[in-house]
Amino acid sequence: MPSEVTPKVPERPSRRKTSELFPLSGSESGDIKANSEPPTPAGTPNVPTRRPILKAKTMTSFESGMDQESLPKVPLQRPVRRSTTEELNNVMNNTSKELEEIESLISKHNIHNVSRKKSPTSVEEGKVAAIHQNGQRSASDNKTSTNPSPLEKNEHEGAEGNESAISPSNLVNKSNNEVTEHSDSEDLTEKQKVHAALDNEAGDRSHFEEKLIPGDMKVQVDVSKDVEEGSLNALPPSGITESDDKAEKFTKHPESSLEELQKHQEQQEEKIFQNPTDEESTTSLNEKQEGKDNMEVNSQPQGPSDTETVIAATSSNVPSQIASEEENDVPVIPRSRPKKDFEAHVQKEELPNTQEKRVSEECDSTLISTEEESKIPKIPSERPKRRAPPPVPKKPSSRIAAFQEMLQKQQQQDLHNNGNSSATTASADIAKKHTDSSITSDTTKADFTSKLNGLFALPGMVNPGQLPPSLEKKLSSPDTESKLGPQDQSQAKTGPLGGTRRGRGPRGRKLPSKVASVEKIEEDDNTNKIEIFNNWNVSSSFSKEKVLIDTTPGEQAERALDEKSKSIPEEQREQSPNKMEAALCPFELDEKEKLPANAESDPLSQLPQTNAVGNRKAISEESLSPSEAIANRDQNDTTEIQEQQMEDQMEVDMERELSGGYEDVDSALHSEEASFHSL
């Protein structure tokens, strides 16, 4: 092996420092990179103080970038979608006829030198244009059988402009012949080279088209259009005099005309291959321009043979254009606005009404027919199938059968018992109703009055002959106990209480002695006893007293009242002890109120009271007659004042006694209710 060579490790590339803010173009940066070598890093790279400025994404930068790229152009007219159900045979026949006509036209007009060499190129250009048009329009132009294609227009245009195109072409040929006679051999060789190059290009194109187009399909070729374009580029159709002047110019510069033709051909090819969408829009515009040019050519003076062809072409073009517009669904704009016919409009309005009437009549007739058909009975085509018998239940087992029999017997017994009991009860009820009907008629009024007594009772008020239901139950309970026998009472007592529960514990063992020795407390339901007694009692005793001469007239009036109260018999007082039949003596009431609460317990405190009462009784026995008392009262005004004071004091005392010392009546009522419930 050769001696080992140590490989050289390249240095790490470093970023080149640039003082420019914006980067250079691609070519300049490439040259700089090729010429300059990466510098060796001296140390740590310097951190830039400013951030590089970015390009502003404005409309100017956007537009500058978009100018370089070719933007697609929007066509002027929207392409019309056509159906693909047409037969291809019609298309083939039409194209074959058009090709034959084009060949006949080309054979008639033999163009010398330049025209012969131009014709194949123009034909091939027309083929290429037709191929791209068919690709973009989805074979729409080739499938129209009735409407004339743009080739027919070009044929008529070629027929109309043949003479106008022949004259400048002949002039060009003459000029070329004159140039060839006077020019040197070098010029001839150069022309031959150019023509040979054009022929080679035409051959290549034809070979390319044969690959693209199938053998059965024939392509529409627009020869007259290309011939006219070539003639227009060489000499615009502005009359015969202008063509003669321009023919002289072409004789002077034959080479320039060839170069212009070549440029024109190349431009067309680039348009066809680059912008097929633009071609569609330009073809429609070119067709319009050709129609205008045809009208101008027709206006020029021509021979008799040419005029006949032009007339035929125009006559054929007009219906073909209308047919093409109908099939392509292109709207036709009329020249004048149509006038409205009022009569026809009225007829149209009347027609739907009549139609609606007819439709309604037909509907009514159909409804009537259906109703009649529904009424007619129809015999069914097939007999209804009989229902299958129900499935036989399985025999139950012996136990189930015995259980069912037992249930049936019990149900039958219950029915018999219920029937007998209901019959007996019904007969008893009927007998009771007859007996009770006479009794109820008499007692209804009494029951009604008795019910009213308890409706409007105030709190604390109880009827003497009626007790509340709770008291009646409690009072009647000892009677029921006496009726029950000793055995029934023992059974009732030994019955389980609702509140007691069975103690949880071990079942198979005896309870401990402490728990077993505990006696159970038995609650007696009927231990409550009720006692009725009077809460308060008022007793009044009156006696005759002798009135002394020194007594005042007020004391005399009091004594007179005491005497009146004595005249009431004592029997009435015993019958109604709770009622106050006469007014009490005000002095006695005052003395009773002033007594302390423990006055009854002290017997000594009652002695002076008894003495005072005895003295008063002695004074009252010697009382004056009422006539004398009245006479004495009229003489003295002081007696009237004292009487008024006494009356006021008595009213206050009576109110205090009735209210029980309460300020409000509601509080007194509540206290009465509380005392009643405590009973």
Curated annotation (Swiss-Prot):
Annotated Basic and acidic residues bias: 9-19, 179-213, 243-272, 339-361, 372-383, 471-482, 556-576, 667-679
GO cellular component terms given for this protein: actin cortical patch; actin cytoskeleton; Aim21-Tda2 complex; mating projection tip
Superkingdom: Eukaryota
Record key words, sorted: Cytoplasm, Cytoskeleton, Phosphoprotein
Region span, Interaction with SH3 domain of ABP1: 383-396
Entries under Pfam families matching the protein: Aim21
Subcellular localization: Cytoplasm, Cytoskeleton, Actin patch
Transmembrane parts of this sequence: none
Polar residues bias locations: 133-149, 164-178, 296-323, 414-427, 437-452, 603-613
Subunit structure: Interacts with ribosomes. Interacts with ABP1.
Protein name, UniProt field: Altered inheritance of mitochondria protein 21
